Amino acid sequence: MTQVAKNDHRLMQVLLAPVVSEKATLVAEKNEQVVFEVARDANKGEVKAAVELLFKVEVESVQILNQKGKQKRFGRFMGRRDHVKKAYVSLKPGQEINFEAEAK
């Protein structure tokens, strides 16, 4: 497991949701990575520890992406969607996360 000593309560709050999109499925098939939306203050060590704790898999590496919110018009006012932080998690060979089986 990971050398990062974090309490389990914090790790349960790091992963917000898996990202299910066309790009995420292509990345999952091609590079054997899983994409998660994570907390804005999470770092790579916390994401790695959280994935290993929740899904009982071994993580090879984590890449973090900060996606800025788009500018949108709301009536006559300009607004902005929320910023999103995503984590691309590479699993070690032979490891996989199946969200369909986990949900049952």
From Swiss-Prot:
InterPro entries: Nucleotide-bd_a/b_plait_sf, Ribosomal_uL23-like, Ribosomal_uL23/eL15/eS24_sf. GO terms for cellular component: ribonucleoprotein complex; ribosome. The keyword rRNA-binding applies. The keyword RNA-binding applies. Keywords: Ribonucleoprotein, Ribosomal protein, RNA-binding, rRNA-binding. Gene3D superfamilies: 3.30.70.330. One of its GO terms (biological process) is translation. One of its GO terms (molecular function) is structural constituent of ribosome. Part of the 50S ribosomal subunit. Contacts protein L29, and trigger factor when it is bound to the ribosome. One of the early assembly proteins it binds 23S rRNA. One of the proteins that surrounds the polypeptide exit tunnel on the outside of the ribosome. Forms the main docking site for trigger factor binding to the ribosome. PANTHER family: 60S RIBOSOMAL PROTEIN L23A. HAMAP family: Ribosomal_uL23_B. Belongs to the universal ribosomal protein uL23 family. This is Large ribosomal subunit protein uL23. The lineage of its organism: Bacteria, Pseudomonadati, Pseudomonadota, Betaproteobacteria, Burkholderiales.
